[in-house]
C-alpha cells in the first residue's frame, strides 16, 4: 500500500562551528538572517499552538458546564460535537491540499490511496453480502477490478482479476482517530461511538480531498463509490 507522510519534518538547529575572525561580512549577515528566520518561525509556531490550546480549553470548559446541568442525551450531543470539531481541526493541520499543491507526487499518491481505500471498503462489504447469499463473487471481483483499473489505479492482475496495489484502509483516518482518542479517551468507550467517529472522519476526509481530483482524469471518491455500488447491484438479488 502506498505510504504517505502526513506531518512535516521537525526543524533541527545544529550547533554552528566557530569561524575565523576575518570572515567576510556578507557571510556574517547571511548567518544572522538565517538564525533570525528560524527564531521568528518558532515564535509564530509557539503563538499558534498557544492559541489553539486556549481555544480547546475554553471549549472544554463550556462542554463541562453543559454536562453538569443537562440531560444525558444533550450531554452526548455537545461532547460529540467537541470531539468532531477537534478532528476537523486536526485534518486542517495535516493540510492535505496545501501539501498536494506543493508536491505533485504527494497529490498523486493521495489520490491513489483514497480511491484504493474506497475500493477495499466496498469490495469487502459487497463480497461479504454476496457470500452470505450464496452468490459467486468471482464475476463481481473481476468487474470491480476493471473499474479500478479504468479509474487509473496502479496494480496487478492475477487469475484474470485486477487488484489495486494500494488497496487497504484510508491512511488519513488513523491520525484523526488517534489524536481524538488521545485527547478524549472517555468518548471512545462504546463501539457505537467509535463507529460514529470513524464514519465522520471518513466523511470529512473525502470532502477535503475532492479538489485534488478536479484537474485529473480520475473519478472523485464519491463517483468511484457510485461506480462500485452500481456494479454490486447487478449481482445482489432484489429479494432479501
Curated annotation (Swiss-Prot):
GO terms assigned for molecular function = GTPase activator activity; guanyl-nucleotide exchange factor activity
Region annotation (GEF catalytic domain) ranges:
78-240
Checking InterPro entries in the record gives: SopE, SopE-like_GEF_dom_sf, SopE_GEF_dom, SopE_N_dom
Provide this UniProt record's keywords sorted from A to Z: GTPase activation, Guanine-nucleotide releasing factor, Secreted, Virulence
- Where does this polypeptide localize? Secreted
Q: Which domain of life is it from?
A: Bacteria
Q: Report any Pfam family annotated for this entry.
A: SopE_GEF
Its BP terms in the Gene Ontology are: actin cytoskeleton organization
Q: One GO term of the cellular component aspect?
A: extracellular region
User: Which ranges does the record mark as transmembrane?
Assistant: none
**Main subcellular location of this protein, as a coarse class:** secreted
Q: What does this protein do?
A: Activator for both CDC42 and RAC1 by directly engaging these Rho GTPases and acting as potent guanine nucleotide exchange factor (GEF). This activation results in actin cytoskeleton rearrangements and stimulates membrane ruffling, promoting bacterial entry into non-phagocytic cells.
Q: Which family does it belong to?
A: Belongs to the GEF (guanine exchange factor) SopE family.
The record's annotation in NCBIfam families points to: PRK15279.1, PRK15280.1
**Other information:** Encoded within a lambda-like prophage region with similarity to GIFSY phages.
User: Under what name is this protein listed?
Assistant: Guanine nucleotide exchange factor SopE
Organism whose genome encodes this protein? Salmonella gallinarum
The record lists the lineage as:
Bacteria, Pseudomonadati, Pseudomonadota, Gammaproteobacteria, Enterobacterales
Amino acid at each position: 500500500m502506498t505510504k504517505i507522510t502526513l506531518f512535516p519534518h521537525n526543524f533541527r538547529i545544529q550547533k554552528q562551528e566557530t569561524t575565523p575572525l576575518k570572515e567576510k561580512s556578507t557571510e556574517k549577515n547571511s548567518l544572522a538572517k538565517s538564525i533570525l528566520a528560524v527564531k521568528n518561525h518558532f515564535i509564530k509556531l509557539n503563538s499558534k499552538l498557544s492559541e489553539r490550546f486556549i481555544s480547546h480549553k475554553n471549549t472544554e470548559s463550556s462542554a463541562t458546564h453543559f454536562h453538569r446541568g443537562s440531560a444525558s442525551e444533550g450531554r452526548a450531543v455537545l461532547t460529540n460535537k467537541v470531539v468532531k470539531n477537534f478532528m476537523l481541526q486536526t485534518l486542517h493541520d495535516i493540510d492535505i491540499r496545501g501539501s498536494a499543491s506543493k508536491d505533485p507526487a504527494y497529490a498523486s499518491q493521495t489520490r491513489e490511496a483514497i480511491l484504493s481505500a474506497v475500493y477495499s471498503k466496498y469490495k469487502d462489504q459487497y463480497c461479504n453480502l454476496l457470500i452470505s447469499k450464496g452468490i459467486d463473487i468471482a464475476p463481481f471481483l473481476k468487474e470491480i477490478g476493471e473499474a479500478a483499473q479504468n479509474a487509473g489505479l496502479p496494480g496487478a492482475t492475477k487469475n484474470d482479476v485486477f487488484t489495486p496495489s494500494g488497496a487497504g484502509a484510508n491512511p488519513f483516518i488513523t491520525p484523526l482517530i488517534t489524536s481524538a482518542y488521545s485527547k478524549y479517551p472517555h468518548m471512545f468507550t462504546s463501539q457505537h461511538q467509535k463507529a460514529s467517529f470513524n464514519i465522520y472522519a471518513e466523511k470529512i476526509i473525502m470532502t477535503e480531498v475532492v479538489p485534488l481530483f478536479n484537474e485529473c482524469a480520475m473519478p472523485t471518491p464519491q463517483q468511484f463509490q457510485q461506480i462500485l455500488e452500481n456494479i454490486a447491484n447487478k449481482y445482489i438479488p432484489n429479494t432479501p
